[in-house]
Regions:
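Short, solvent-exposed secondary-structure boundary/capping segments
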Residues: 39-47
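Short beta-strand-centered aromatic/proline hotspots
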Residues: 23-38
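Short coil-to-beta transition motif at edge beta-strands of beta-rich domains
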Residues: 1-24
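Residue-level detector of intrinsically disordered, flexible termini
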Residues: 13, 33, 42-43, 90
Length: 129
């Protein structure tokens, strides 16, 4: 996801990265995109916001993270960052992906499967060991 994919005036959805990492559910905060720069996107809290009247100190900056293209992250140095999505559908897909990754990493008892079943899973995933 790139900054140029957003437009000024667009309603976007932010989530605490902590909530998504710990699978606490999707509790969105709605923001309105106020400014778009080369490195940062600035958004104002709320859905029905007149972005021309919001002072700069109330705008929250978001940037493209180096490690993923799935979302934008809040530009802060400490604490839990908020992550920004252009719509709820993309946010739900990302949350579902995190749940599946966690489930497949720790929720499945792989030892209970036979060798043939594990080889079939390996074929489906297309990975070599």
């Amino acid at each position: 996801m790139k900054i140029k994919d957003f437009t000024v005036g667009q309603v976007v959805y932010a989530f605490s990265y902590e909530d998504i990492a710990l699978l606490k559910g999707l509790k969105p905060k709605k923001y309105t995109v106020a400014k778009i720069g080369r490195k940062y996107l600035y958004a104002a809290r709320g859905e029905e916001v007149n972005i021309k009247t919001v002072p700069d100190n109330l705008l929250i900056g978001f940037k493209e993270p180096d490690y993923t293209d799935d979302f934008l992250e809040e530009n802060i140095d400490y604490g839990y960052k908020a992550i920004l999505f252009p719509d709820m559908e993309i946010a739900k897909d990302y949350y579902h992906k995190r749940k599946l990754v966690r489930f497949l990493a720790s929720g499945v008892k792989w030892e209970s499967y036979t060798l043939d079943e594990l080889k079939e899973i390996q074929k489906i995933l297309g990975v070599q060991v």
